[in-house]
């Protein structure tokens, strides 16, 4: 990599709640060369693989999944918060430190046997991505890899996703 991407991630203490060190990716996104480098790195990793789609998780996962899907010439499948998709959906509830949340994906988004990469911006505990992967598998599709811009290693999300091939660009 030509840019130190980690230098473009801003740390925001006590956001959104006290005790959280939020990783703000907006400086990286504002830097055209750095954003291009992220997409180019991901595209180089997945070019030539027999992929059918890139799955992006609302909302910041969309920032990376859409241009990557475009570059690879494959579909982009959005996984969204409840009530945002207009058609029949799979839904998976998952645990957070302070409660539960739910994600949805259109039932017809992926054909059985489709091969996908699931992308999100930050890996923390892994609950969100595990739920996304569960929906991909409910559709009969195959998770070829999970990928992240940032991995918060101290939260051990990678362990929760141990059954999937894994890639992260920046580790804290």
Curated annotation (Swiss-Prot):
Coiled coil location: none
Keyword terms of this UniProt record: Cytoplasm, Glycosyltransferase, Purine salvage, Transferase
Annotated InterPro entries: Ade_phspho_trans, PRibTrfase_dom, PRTase-like, UPRTase/APRTase
UniProt main location, coarse: cytoplasm
Compartments in which it is found: Cytoplasm
Catalytic activity: AMP + diphosphate = 5-phospho-alpha-D-ribose 1-diphosphate + adenine
Function: Catalyzes a salvage reaction resulting in the formation of AMP, that is energically less costly than de novo synthesis.
Family: Belongs to the purine/pyrimidine phosphoribosyltransferase family.
Name recorded for this polypeptide: Adenine phosphoribosyltransferase
């Amino acid at each position: 990599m030509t840019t130190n991407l980690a230098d473009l991630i801003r740390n925001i203490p006590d956001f959104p709640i006290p005790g959280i060190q939020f990783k703000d990716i907006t400086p990286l996104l504002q830097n055209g060369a750095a954003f291009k480098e992220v997409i180019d790195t991901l595209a180089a990793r997945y070019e030539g693989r027999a992929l059918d789609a890139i799955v992006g998780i609302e909302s910041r996962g969309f920032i990376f999944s859409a241009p990557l899907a475009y570059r690879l010439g494959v579909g982009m499948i959005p996984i969204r918060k409840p009530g945002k998709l207009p058609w029949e959906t799979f839904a998976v509830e998952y645990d957070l430190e302070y409660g539960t949340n739910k994600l949805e994906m259109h039932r017809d988004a992926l054909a059985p046997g489709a091969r996908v990469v699931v992308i999100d911006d930050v890996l923390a505990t892994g609950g969100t991505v595990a739920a996304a992967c569960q929906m991909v598998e409910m559709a009969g599709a195959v998770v070829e890899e999970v990928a992240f811009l940032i991995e918060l290693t101290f939260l051990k999300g990678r362990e929760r996703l141990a059954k999937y091939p894994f890639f992260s660009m920046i580790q804290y």
